[in-house]
Structure formats: C-alpha cells, structure tokens
Amino acid sequence: MQDLSPHPGDLDPIETASTDELRALQLERLSWTLEHAYRNVPHYRAAFDAAGVRPEDLETLDDLARFPFTAKSDLRENYPFGMFAVPRDQVVRVHASSGTTGRPTVVGYPRDDLDVWATVVARSIRAAGGRAGDILHNAYGYGLFTGGLGAHYGAEKLGCLVVPVSGGQTERQVQLIQDFQPDIIMVTPSYMLSIIDEMERQGIDPRSTSLKVGIFGAEPWTNDMRREMEARLDMHAVDIYGLSEVIGPGVASECVETKDGLTVWEDHFYPEIVDPVTMQPVPDGEEGELVFTSLTKQAMPIIRYRTRDLTRLLPGTARSMRRIEKITGRTDDMIILRGVNLFPTQIEELILQTPALAPHFQCVLTRPGQLDELTVLVEPREGAVDTASDAAERLRHLIKDRIGVTVVVDVRAPGEVERSAGKARRLVDERPKR
C-alpha cells in the first residue's frame, strides 16, 4: 500500500494548534452556541430553565456538564422544524433520518452550515489520504440520508473528481470502478464486502483495482474487518464517523498515517463521554456513551446530544485534537443474554477469526420458551462449503469462551444472509412484543 500521509503544510492550522489555543476557541464558540440556542429555540429555553441553568453560567468547559442532554426523542417531538434556530427561509436544505422506528429526525442547513459540513468532510478525506485531483467513487446513498451528499460536497471542496454512483446496482459499481479507475471509494463497510464479492464472482482480482483508500462509515466495523478488506483490496481502510443530528459524516475521521482512532474535529464539535447509567462525565480514557455539542452550527445547534455510541476519548496523535476509539457498539443494540452484555461487533471479530466463514452475518434474537435465544446466521467462504459445519462449531465455542454465552450458529448457503447497499442490519429482534 502507498504512503498517503498528508504533507504538514496541507493541514489546517487548527489541526496542529496547542491544547490551550483549541480550548480557548472551544469555550468562545460554546458560549455563542448556548446563547444562540437559548434565545432562538423554545425547546432549549425550556430545558435550560427546567435545569436551572443559563448560557452565562458557562465559565469553563467543565461547566457544560450542568446543561441538559438532548435526545433523538426531543428532535422527533419538535418535528419537523421546531429545533431550527434561524428563520425557515434561511434554510436551503434539509436531511432526515429514515424514521423506521418513528418520525424522522429532521436537520436543516443554511449555506454557512453547508460550508462547514463540506469543510470537515474535506478535512476527513484528506486525513484518510485523499488529495485534490483524486477520483472518488461515492457509493453512499443519496437523498435524505446525509452520507451521499455529505461525501459528495466534501470531496468537491477538497478538489476531487466525484463519481456520484450512490448505493445499489453492485454489478454497475464494479464496472464503473474498472472503467473510471478511482483512487478513493466511500461506502459502508458491509456494502464494500458485497462489492468485493461481486468482483470475485466476475473473476476480477480486487487487489488489481486502482483503489488506494476506502473511507468506510455509517456503521460500526472492527479492526479485524480492516485487516480483511486491506488484505483483499491492497488499499488503506479508514474509518469516518458522523451522524445527521450533529451534522452528518465528517464529525471525526481516522488519519491514514496512524489508523489508531478517529480524530474529532474539535473546532466544530465538542465531545464528552458519560456513564450511560449515571449520565455523569467520565475521565478521558474510560469507556462510555459519546455525547456531542456543536460549536459552529447556525440553523440547528445541538446541545449535549446523546449518540448512544460507546467509545473512549483518547489524546491526539497525528493531530493535536483528541481521538475517539473505534465505536464498539451502541447502547441500543446491546444484547443482554443470560446476564451477559454483548454487541454484534464482538460476534464480527470472532467470525473474522474463523477462516472458513465469510464476513457476512446477522444476529437474530428469539424467545422460543421462557428464555431468550441468540442465533448467528453465517455463510461459508467460497470453496469452504464442506468445512462450514466444523467452522460453525468452532465459532460457537469461540463465542462461549470469549464472550461467555451459548448461541446457535446457523450456516446458510452463500448469498442467503441479508445484504444491504447501506447500513447492514446486524441485529434482528424477533421476540414477541409484550
């Protein structure tokens, strides 16, 4: 793989600023954000008043812990435009979550917010090894989902040539990669695996493509999956993080020269880690739930937003800004089985340690009697059908030994485990509703 480390002169000055400079900027921007939200968003005014705090109570960054959290339910209760802090006619675009479990969460952007968004995505692509003039194959979905357009405008701002393929039509994805010879692909990691499988089905060696780096996000993925994709594609696999409620993709990104966690662009987003039970902040280095406060958003400032993602805050390495560890799971996709907490990402790690099994899987929760049961659907790799049963038994023992729970491992025929051109549905809950 090529050395894609950016030249120090290409970085924004804030990326290498001192901690004191960065904290002073954060305090200034945080003070503005709290005042802006309090004055212009009735929800925040009511929430601050109920908590007995006002914007002027923020004297240090630690004082942010006195302010109330914002949850996805707050956004849904103020659907569609109740969280906007600017007049609606200043908003030039909206995005929204899928709304599969209720009303969608709507996010609005005036032109200045779109420019900030493009800036942090461009910074993320550059951190991943991208350069002006690179061809970028964008296989994130376009539409209300923030992935496609967020990646698109960030890549254009960096100076890339963007191929706006969107998701789906896997054969066409492979054809365009062959024809246009892109340097970069942006896509969900699970769909990248489907693209690799299609290349191999067509007799194309994935290692022979022009791709130098894949920027993968929108769902948790492990370092074992990184090794899998880098080995099969001979390219760098780099993580990008974001969520629509905060801005979209580009909140944090791995740096290609280290790949040791995702640098949070702290000049625009202030991170905290809190204990998901007590909701109290925990020191850097301890695992907990990731919480974000926006620092520069005008249309929809977000205050202490609970992401439900589990991670740790770590010191900066390639940049002076702090890093978050790869997301280990979500508080809302945690499976509790026989008193043991586990996450789909833990299952993924063990599948990737089982050579005869493909990296496609799905966890299915059922309750056949009085107790919950977890079934892990897996597939054999090409050429490993005859050894799949033994591999499944090995996986079952690995899960029992490493995680401490007994599961059923069900081997399906190649191609039977559900695929997705977007976020993979790793957990299906088929238990009866109470």
List where the protein language model places each region.
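AMP-binding/adenylate-forming catalytic core of the ANL superfamily
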Residues: 185, 291, 295-403, 422
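Short, solvent-exposed loop/turn segments at the edges of secondary structure
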Residues: 209, 265-268, 330
